[in-house]
Amino acid sequence: MPGDQVILLSLMALGVVARNALIVTAAGVVLILRVLALERFFPLLERRGLEAGLIFLLIAVLVPFATGEVGWAEIRQSFTSWTGLAAILGGIIAAVLSGYGVTLLQVKPEVIVGMVVGTILGVVLFKGIPVGPLAAAGFTAILLALVRGH
């Protein structure tokens, strides 16, 4: 069995042990594509997979606006409460960190391997959620800056 398939099966096993359906499903889909010799879809998934995932995430977040569960009162409150202001600041920080992440990935694309391993360990061992390579790269960029002292 080729090494890439062993890695994907190992990831699936880790996901099963950790009871994480996301890792099991993702590794399983990639493994099936590989076994069925459908690698031609890999570049598309690499280029557009994150974008598609973010679109679905945003759709899920926007549904409460469409259902009326969140309206103008809640929007106004986000600008006038400590919780709302903290959420706005959190969003700004996340966007800035993701910007640092893009820069890091452009300058040192090899960090993606460590980030993937770290993300898997975080999901499997600490019940984390894979937030995506831009956020992980942003945190990595900050950690590198702290270690290097600039």
Swiss-Prot record:
It is a multi-pass membrane protein. InterPro entries: UPF0756_TM. Keywords: Cell membrane, Membrane, Transmembrane, Transmembrane helix. The chain crosses the membrane at residues 13-33, 52-72, 85-105, 111-131. Coiled coil: none annotated. GO terms for cellular component: plasma membrane. It comes from the Bacteria. It is found in: Cell membrane. HAMAP family: UPF0756. Belongs to the UPF0756 family. This is UPF0756 membrane protein STH2648. The lineage of its organism: Bacteria, Bacillati, Bacillota, Clostridia, Eubacteriales.
